[in-house]
UniProtKB/Swiss-Prot annotation:
Taxonomic path: Eukaryota, Metazoa, Chordata, Craniata, Vertebrata
Domain Ig-like: 24-117
Organism per entry: Homo sapiens (Human)
GO cellular component: extracellular region; immunoglobulin complex; plasma membrane
Name of the protein in its database record: Probable non-functional immunoglobulinn kappa variable 1-37
Record-annotated disulphide pairs: none
N-terminal signal peptide: 1-22
GO biological process, one term: adaptive immune response
Functional summary from the UniProt entry: Probable non-functional open reading frame (ORF) of V region of the variable domain of immunoglobulin light chains. Non-functional ORF generally cannot participate in the synthesis of a productive immunoglobulin chain due to altered V-(D)-J or switch recombination and/or splicing site (at mRNA level) and/or conserved amino acid change (protein level). Immunoglobulins, also known as antibodies, are membrane-bound or secreted glycoproteins produced by B lymphocytes.
Subunit structure: Most probably, the immunoglobulin is not assembled due to incorrect folding of light chain. Immunoglobulins are composed of two identical heavy chains and two identical light chains; disulfide-linked.
InterPro entries attached to this UniProt entry: Ig-like_dom, Ig-like_dom_sf, Ig-like_fold, Ig_V-set, IgV_Light_Chain
Length: 117
């Protein structure tokens, strides 16, 4: 039985930092996708300016606060399943789910950060 899982993604993020100009844009792709349980899913994030490895990945489910998955581009947050991984630096970043599970249906987004949590 083919169980399709829609993974909803946030397409465009504008970052605001207190005391700083709002001039960095993060653009994610795809803006939405449909995948099957067990599929490998890749989400990319392109940043308008180089930010080294200062990017975190979050997952948010309806009515819940965002959950940190990956910090500093490639570090798995404690307690997060190993099917999640992150890579990239500078302007191009990737979040990969190696084997999609039903509980992974959510909104995923990248956020520029200044340091590890």
């Amino acid at each position: 039985m083919d169980m399709r899982v829609p993974a909803q993604l946030l397409g465009l993020l504008l970052l605001w930092v207190p005391g700083a100009r709002c001039d960095i844009q993060l653009t994610q792709s795809p803006s939405s996708l449909s995948a099957s349980v067990g599929d490998r899913v890749t989400i990319t994030c392109r940043v308008s300016q180089g930010i080294s490895s200062y990017l975190n990945w979050y997952r948010q489910k309806p009515g819940k606060v965002p959950k940190l998955l990956i910090y500093s581009a490639s570090n798995l947050q404690s307690g997060v399943p190993s099917r999640f991984s992150g890579s990239g630096s500078g302007t191009d970043f990737t979040l990969t789910i190696s084997s999609l599970q039903p509980e992974d249906v959510a909104t995923y987004y990248g956020q520029r950060t200044y340091n590890a949590p």
